[in-house]
Amino acid sequence: KVEVIVSTLNDFQALALLEALKKVGHTKVSLLGGDTIKTTDMSKGAGLVEGVYATSPILEAKEFTTGRPFLEKYQAAFKKAPAYGGHYTYDSMYVLSAAIQNAKSADPKEITKALRTINGYAPVIGTMTWDEKGEQRYGAVGVYELRGGNWELRMRSDRW
């Protein structure tokens, strides 16, 4: 008996799968996917099966202490919500600026060297740091559940 489907599908593919499962009466199953299903379009899949879950390395701005003020200021300035993951871009600009200042150069190689040694201030998520290979240190993955048409955080890998 299948209880969980682990998927690498995109949202539109996952929705088609959920609709097909409902059509054949196989709804006592949960779908687990990645951030490719953690979209607003997936809200159409709420209630088609017992559960829909997604993991994502992109935590929402509202999940950070300073996230709500960022969202309020952005909404006031641009009259719409930021793009998915936009707070990471916002924070990255602060870190990049600090790296350019530390490198005292606009040379990409010097900036890259500086980025690998920086503990950069990031206004929304706190800090951004990278290892010698360029991988972000201390990143977190969120586990989300689709409930009532909205994605709700269930747990974070940095707080198991």
Regions found by a protein language model. Give the residues of each.
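Extracytosolic ligand-binding ectodomains
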Residues: 1-160
